[in-house]
């Protein structure tokens, strides 16, 4: 789950990270009121109007504008709200802007990068800093990796004071700015760890001419599997920013990710799902989705899975690959039969059932009047996919 910038900034502020004052707005009038409030309470004379979508590269796409007056805020808000903002992370269709953040402007002397993420190779948390702030850290890592400094934090020990100082030194800071950077690093790490984040990022973290350290942007990704421990964060979820098909799948307890291929697949277990996608590619097709029905597959979830997959007009064949451990194959087969009664399955259907009650499941399918192709081995399933695509 991703947070909007304004939500991430609010979270960071709770952990002592200095963040410029800002107010979120959903209408032009609300944006103007926000600017006037910042003008009155903070003596702000410079404003930044920022589109709130779950994607980077907003500035290059026209979603971040500088305003020197309240009237300019009105003009920019009118242009940004409702626009389909296209960035390198949204795809060509873009994302509709429904909210903007109006913040007071900050004079910038130097930009830095600060981020915390999970390093799966070491099973530790990695904190990264760079003097190349304000640009994609991936670009810096590729072109100038020596400009990124990292420390790894063992979760069983926690972040040590010498590590925060090491990072602040790597940023080239001294004096009060050094102390503020140490506090920002400590606060960001605590926010990351205590809220089960997979990523907490400030890009850029800036130093003002007066030597203050401010987080002028913020990004947070949360671990979906830990959201039950953070109901306050789960309430921040913005379904408008997520794939509607994936949201619908989640409502049925299905793990679904849309892909660009032509073969739909329904599988139980993430490992088997990835192996199935490999099989589809070897067969000459491209997977149209990742769909894991999990360990509690029922007739209802199978039918929901079929509906979701078949909504994709690019699907030319459908492979159902089930290994029955906790899942009973006869229950899945019954789900297929029930789904076929309620849905027009107008593409070739290949079914592979192995494991618990597989023979009973095959019997149910054989005795039904469904037009489908059965497979026992993965290779057979691949051959059937090849044949189905060749007939199209």
Swiss-Prot record:
Cofactor note as given: Binds 1 Mg(2+) ion per subunit.
InterPro entries from the UniProt entry: ATP-grasp (IPR011761), ATP-grasp_succ-CoA_synth-type (IPR013650), ATP_grasp_subdomain_1 (IPR013815), Succ-CoA_synthase_bsu_CS (IPR017866), SUCC_ACL_C (IPR005811), Succ_CoA_ligase-like_bsu (IPR005809), Succinyl-CoA_synth-like (IPR016102)
UniProt binding sites for Mg(2+): 203, 217
Catalytic activity: succinate + ATP + CoA = succinyl-CoA + ADP + phosphate; GTP + succinate + CoA = succinyl-CoA + GDP + phosphate
This protein's record includes keyword Nucleotide-binding: yes
Any one annotated GO CC term: succinate-CoA ligase complex
Membrane-traversing stretches: none
Pathway: Carbohydrate metabolism; tricarboxylic acid cycle; succinate from succinyl-CoA (ligase route): step 1/1
Cofactor(s) this protein cannot do without: Mg(2+)
Binding-site residues for substrate, renumbered to this chain: 268, 325-327
Domain ATP-grasp: 9-248
Source organism superkingdom: Bacteria
UniProt keyword terms in alphabetical order: ATP-binding, Ligase, Magnesium, Metal-binding, Nucleotide-binding, Tricarboxylic acid cycle
Binding site for ATP: 50, 57-59, 106, 111
Biological process, per Gene Ontology: succinyl-CoA metabolic process; tricarboxylic acid cycle
SUPFAM superfamilies: Glutathione synthetase ATP-binding domain-like, Succinyl-CoA synthetase domains
Quaternary structure annotation from Swiss-Prot or TrEMBL: Heterotetramer of two alpha and two beta subunits.
Functional summary from the UniProt entry: Succinyl-CoA synthetase functions in the citric acid cycle (TCA), coupling the hydrolysis of succinyl-CoA to the synthesis of either ATP or GTP and thus represents the only step of substrate-level phosphorylation in the TCA. The beta subunit provides nucleotide specificity of the enzyme and binds the substrate succinate, while the binding sites for coenzyme A and phosphate are found in the alpha subunit.
The protein's name: Succinate--CoA ligase [ADP-forming] subunit beta
Taxon lineage: Bacteria, Pseudomonadati, Rhodothermota, Rhodothermia, Rhodothermales
């Amino acid at each position: 789950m991703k947070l909007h910038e304004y939500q991430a900034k609010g979270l960071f502020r709770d952990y002592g990270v200095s963040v410029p004052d800002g107010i979120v707005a959903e209408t032009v009038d609300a944006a103007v009121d926000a600017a006037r409030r910042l003008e009155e309470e903070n003596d702000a004379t410079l404003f930044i109007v920022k589109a709130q979508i779950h994607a980077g590269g907003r500035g290059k796409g026209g979603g971040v504008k500088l305003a020197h007056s309240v009237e300019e805020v009105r003009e920019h808000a009118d242009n940004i709200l409702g626009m389909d903002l296209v960035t390198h992370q949204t795809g060509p269709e873009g994302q509709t802007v429904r909210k903007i953040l109006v913040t007071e402007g900050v004079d910038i002397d130097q930009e830095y990068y600060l981020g915390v993420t999970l390093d799966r190779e070491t099973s530790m948390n990695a904190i990264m800093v760079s003097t190349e702030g304000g640009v994609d850290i991936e670009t810096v890592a590729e072109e100038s990796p020596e400009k990124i400094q990292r420390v790894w934090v063992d979760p069983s020990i926690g972040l040590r004071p010498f590590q925060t100082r090491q990072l602040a030194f790597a940023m080239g800071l001294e004096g009060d700015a050094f102390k503020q950077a140490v506090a920002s690093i400590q606060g960001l790490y605590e926010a990351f760890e205590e809220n089960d984040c997979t990523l907490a990022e400030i890009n850029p973290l800036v130093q003002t001419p007066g030597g203050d350290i401010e987080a002028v942007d913020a990004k947070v990704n949360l671990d979906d599997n830990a959201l039950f421990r953070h109901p306050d964060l789960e309430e921040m979820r913005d379904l408008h920013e997520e794939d509607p098909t994936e949201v619908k799948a989640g409502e049925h307890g299905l793990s679904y990710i849309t892909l660009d291929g032509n073969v739909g697949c329904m599988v139980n277990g993430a490992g088997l799902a990835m192996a199935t996608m490999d099989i589809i590619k070897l067969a000459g097709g491209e997977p149209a989705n990742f769909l894991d029905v999990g360990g509690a597959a029922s007739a209802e979830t199978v039918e929901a899975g079929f509906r979701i997959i078949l909504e994709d007009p690019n699907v030319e064949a459908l492979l159902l690959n089930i290994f029955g451990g906790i899942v009973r194959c006869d229950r899945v087969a019954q789900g297929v039969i029930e789904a076929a009664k309620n849905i027009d399955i107008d593409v070739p259907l290949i079914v592979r059932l192995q494991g618990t009650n597989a023979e009973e499941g095959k019997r149910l399918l054989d005795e039904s009047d469904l037009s489908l192709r059965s497979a026992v081995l993965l290779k057979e399933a691949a051959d059937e996919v090849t044949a189905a695509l060749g007939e199209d």
